[in-house]
């Protein structure tokens, strides 16, 4: 399940790529009901990764929304599997999931979650040339020509709601 802003969506998509390698039947959905989607589905805008809009994906989205409201879906093999609260890598979650429909919900930020697909992740998150965006395309060529380029992603959400100082203490 993909939701939240660009940084989270990137980690979630990388996790999807890793799960798909383990189980080729794996599908990804965008949580259209999430209250935390800053600009909607950012992966298409930033990297050209389109949302799959097949009937199956639409049905999976509806089942996901309903399963969050009605627990009875568990009895027919619909499960929501959450990332551990401490965000630790859990190798067991990378195995093929139990029978039925399994929704994996979390940030999945540990690089260990997608170590089995490094090339696929790098390919997915390459910037593509943008039509009618001359300045962007000029910078893209500069970045591609420099072997020491660095990417910085500023987490907008971290600056929208500043937490009290105690929140940042260990």
Role assignments for model-derived ranges:
Residues 38-170:
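Secretory-pathway luminal glycosyltransferase catalytic domains
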Residues 2-4, 30-33, 153-154:
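Short His-Asn-centered micro-motif
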Residues 23-27, 147-149:
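A general structural motif
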Residues 25-37:
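A short beta-strand-loop structural module common to alpha/beta enzyme folds
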């Amino acid at each position: 399940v993909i939701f939240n802003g660009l940084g989270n969506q990137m980690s979630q998509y990388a996790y999807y790529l890793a799960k798909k390698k383990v189980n080729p039947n794996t599908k990804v959905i965008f949580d259209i009901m999430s209250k935390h989607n800053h600009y909607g589905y950012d992966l298409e805008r930033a990297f050209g990764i389109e949302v799959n809009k097949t009937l199956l994906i639409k049905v999976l989205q509806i089942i996901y929304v309903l399963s969050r409201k009605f627990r009875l879906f568990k009895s027919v093999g619909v499960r929501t599997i959450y990332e551990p609260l401490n965000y630790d890598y859990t190798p067991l979650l990378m195995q093929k999931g139990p029978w039925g429909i399994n929704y994996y919900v979390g940030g999945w930020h540990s690089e260990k979650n997608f170590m089995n697909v490094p090339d696929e992740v790098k390919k997915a998150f390459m910037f593509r040339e943008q039509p009618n965006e001359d300045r962007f395309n000029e910078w893209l060529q500069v970045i591609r020509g420099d072997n020491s380029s660095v990417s910085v992603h500023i987490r907008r959400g971290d600056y929208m709601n500043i937490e009290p100082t105690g929140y940042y203490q260990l």
